[in-house]
Design a protein with these regions (language model features):
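Short, Asp-centered acidic motifs that coordinate Mg2+ and/or phosphate
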Residues: 29-30, 72-73, 123
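Short, conserved SAM-binding/catalytic segment
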Residues: 41-48, 112-120
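N-terminal Rossmann-like NAD(P) cofactor-binding subdomain of oxidoreductases
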Residues: 102, 121-123
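Short loop-beta-helix segment that forms the pyridoxal 5′-phosphate
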Residues: 50-51, 123-125
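Conserved hydrophobic packing residues within short motifs/helices of P-loop NTPase cores
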Residues: 5-7, 98, 125
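Beta-loop-alpha module in the N-terminal Rossmann-like domain of NAD(P)-dependent dehydrogenases
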Residues: 50-116
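N-terminal Rossmann-like dinucleotide-binding module
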Residues: 1-46, 69
């Protein structure tokens, strides 16, 4: 069983990611969205933590990591312009990424992701 986080829970595609996580026998530990999306979350993973501030999400992920509860994947369903920074955050923390399309908006961001994959050992799937 893999442990997931989700960034961007209120979007159109997020419920499909949540359904796929559940149907494949995995679990969602935490989610983040600037909009209150607890209703969406509760229909799939009522036990998951939920934050509306990225800083709180980061603090939770770091706390879990210190407790030996590292995440396996971050599913990114945030607005397109936030995909690159959210993937950068996950990769820097050694967490593999699943991202909705478009993956990035520029070739520079794509090159950066490749460098981060090599440097931190995590992958964009």
């Amino acid at each position: 069983m893999k442990k997931f986080a989700l960034i961007g829970a209120a979007g159109y595609i997020a419920p499909r990611h949540l359904k796929a996580i559940k149907e494949t026998g995995n679990t969602l530990a935490v989610a983040m969205d600037v909009n209150d999306s607890v209703g969406i979350m509760d229909s799939h993973f009522p036990e998951a933590e939920f934050f509306t501030e990225f800083e709180e999400f980061e603090a939770y992920v770091e706390d879990q990591k210190l407790k030996g509860e590292k995440l396996d994947y971050v599913a990114i369903c945030s607005p397109n312009y936030l995909h690159a920074p959210h993937m950068k955050y996950a990769l820097k923390n050694g967490i593999d990424v699943i991202c909705e399309k478009p993956l990035v908006l520029s070739s520079e961001d794509l090159n950066m992701l490749s460098e981060y994959e090599q440097q931190y050992g995590a992958k964009v799937n």
